[in-house]
Structures are given as structure tokens and as C-alpha cells.
Amino acid sequence: MKTVSIIGGTGYTGSELLRLLSNHDKVEVLNVTSRKEAGKKLTDFHPQVRNLRNYNDLEFQNIAPEDIDTDIVFCATPHGASMAIVPTLHEKGINIIDLSGDYRFEDIEMYESWYGLKHTGKIESAVYGLPELHREKIKKSKTIANPGCYPTGAILSMAPLVANDLVDERIIFDSKSGVSGAGVVASQTTHFPNVNENLGAYKITKHRHSPEIGKELEYLGNKRLKVSFTPHLLPVTRGILTTAHSYLKEDVSRVDVIEIYEEFYKDEFFVRIFEESMPSLTGVRGTNFCDIGGFEIDQHGRIVVVSAIDNLVKGASGQAIQNMNIIMGFDEKEGLSVGGMRP
């Protein structure tokens, strides 16, 4: 049995890690940290995991990184906090999955420009943890940068077309997310009276997930791309629905496109291709699946692909566990083989 620590256990991603790991037969959670809630019972804060595993016996702890001695550490901390923690854990040889944006960019200047933070803890060996594209690199690394929620759904929706050089350099992503993607701390934007029965766009050209999407697709296609991304906030708790648009470079049919997607993802359990029906938020709610469908081509050669993920699972904690399974040599599906909560 491998041991796990969760640094930052009071947010939504920490909560989801606890829920999902309760079904994992190969690991045991020993430490869950929180400076603010230190000394309080874990299940008083997270009643949804009461009576599961050893959780009734755990209290939040305020542990320094140098005092952590588990096999695996999930850093479920805000952007900017992980870079102060991860280098110490890395030096100790601990397997790390960081759910913040701190290690998603090899180009530190790009990170600093988009996140507005000075990066102080670069680790050259950190690997971008999108298993469908980087599985072999993940296997060889001990520090994994878990992808962002929006980038996960966006990249997977267009990866087969980019990899096969079937679309031109213009790719547009329109994504709509549930409110939990904004984090556990409420704001004017996410306050119930403001978000309920409403739909709004935000950071329409300058969201920090834009360069993350772009760099991964450019790496895959080995060419420069003009990636545009606009997010929207939905009055729902979970889920991201992404509509991706680009223009085909050659005359291919919808059947051809579907075959390309099925071939590209033929060994990917967590990617489901919908030939006829459309992906939905309820179909992936609570799961680690990315559902992809649409594949419609209009009279101008514009192709439209739709993807759906749960932003807290495949977009965060579930993908983090998938990455842990890979680096630890576990079955990749361990702890993650559940269907969507539909309706």
C-alpha cells in the first residue's frame, strides 16, 4: 500500500481527491494539510467522505514540506504556492502531482507574463501531465504538472486533427464552465444571485489557459498556430462544454473525421467518441471521461467538434490520480472506473 499526502485539502480539488481516492485499492491517505483548519477533523469539513476509509481518524495538519514522508504528494494549492513547496519535495525524491499552473510551462517568461507571478522554483524534469499525449514522459518523471481544466477539454477535442495536419492554423475554442471551476472562495462573479439564471463571458481574449492550449497543440502539430479561447460561466456546479472550430485543409468527410478520432484514441479508456449523439455535462459528471462528438462540417469547410468533461475530475483531481497511477505503475483506471451521474 502506497501512502499519500494532500497539500491543500480544503478546496474543491482536495475534496475530489479524497472522494476518488476512497475507491482506490493501492493507496492510503495519511496527511491532509491546511494551515487555517489545522487540528480540525477532516470529516467535519468534508462530511461527504465520513465513514470512508480512514478519513474519520484524520485531522487537518500544518506540515512543512521537509517533514512530509509519503510516497506520493498531491499539491492542491493555489497558483504561486506550489513553487514554494515542490522543490523541497522534489529533492526528497517524492512523486509529486501539482494541480496548480506553476509547472505547466517550460517557458518561465510565458508563465510569469500570463500569471503575473515571479517563478522561483523551476524544475527542469517536470512533465505536462496530459496522459493521452505524454504518457511515456509521465512514466519517467516524478514531478507532474496536472493540466488546467479548460485546456484538457480543448486540447483533446482538437488533438487528432492537429496531429494529422488536417486543419489550418486558426483554431477557436468556446468553453462554458460550471461555477466550481472558479474555486471554493466566492466572488461577485460566482455569488449565487449573480450567476443563477445567467450566462456570461469573461476574460474573452486574455484567459491564462490560452497559452497552455496553444503550446500543447503547437507541440503536437509541430507548427505555429493561431489559437483563440473564450470562456463562459454557466449557472451549474460542474462541467465544461467546449465547442472547437477550425477550417479543414483538405476535403474529408464526417465519416473520415470520426475514423481519425477513433484511431487516435483507440487505446484511451477515458476518451469516448460519440458518432451520433452529443456530449453532455451530465454524461461526464463525477467521472474522469472526456466525451467528444459533433464532427460536423459546414459549407465553408469549417469543422466543429464538441467535448465535455467534469472540470473537477478529468479537469483536475481525476486526471491527477490518472497521472499517479501511471507513474506508480498501477492500472490507469484504478479508482476512476465510474459512470456519469445522469440525470
UniProtKB/Swiss-Prot annotation:
Pfam families: Semialdhyde_dh (PF01118), Semialdhyde_dhC_1 (PF22698). InterPro entries: AGPR_AS, AGPR_type-1, NAD(P)-bd_dom_sf, NAGSA_dehydrogenase, Semialdehyde_DH_NAD-bd. One of its GO terms (biological process) is L-arginine biosynthetic process. Pathway: Amino-acid biosynthesis; L-arginine biosynthesis; N(2)-acetyl-L-ornithine from L-glutamate: step 3/4. The keyword Magnesium does not apply. It catalyses: N-acetyl-L-glutamate 5-semialdehyde + phosphate + NADP(+) = N-acetyl-L-glutamyl 5-phosphate + NADPH + H(+). One of its GO terms (molecular function) is NADP+ binding. One of its GO terms (cellular component) is cytoplasm. It is found in: Cytoplasm. The active site is at residue 149. Its EC number is 1.2.1.38. Keywords: Amino-acid biosynthesis, Arginine biosynthesis, Cytoplasm, NADP, Oxidoreductase. SUPFAM superfamilies: Glyceraldehyde-3-phosphate dehydrogenase-like, C-terminal domain (SSF55347), NAD(P)-binding Rossmann-fold domains (SSF51735). Belongs to the NAGSA dehydrogenase family. Type 1 subfamily. Catalyzes the NADPH-dependent reduction of N-acetyl-5-glutamyl phosphate to yield N-acetyl-L-glutamate 5-semialdehyde. This is N-acetyl-gamma-glutamyl-phosphate reductase. It comes from Methanococcus maripaludis (strain C5 / ATCC BAA-1333). The gene is argC.
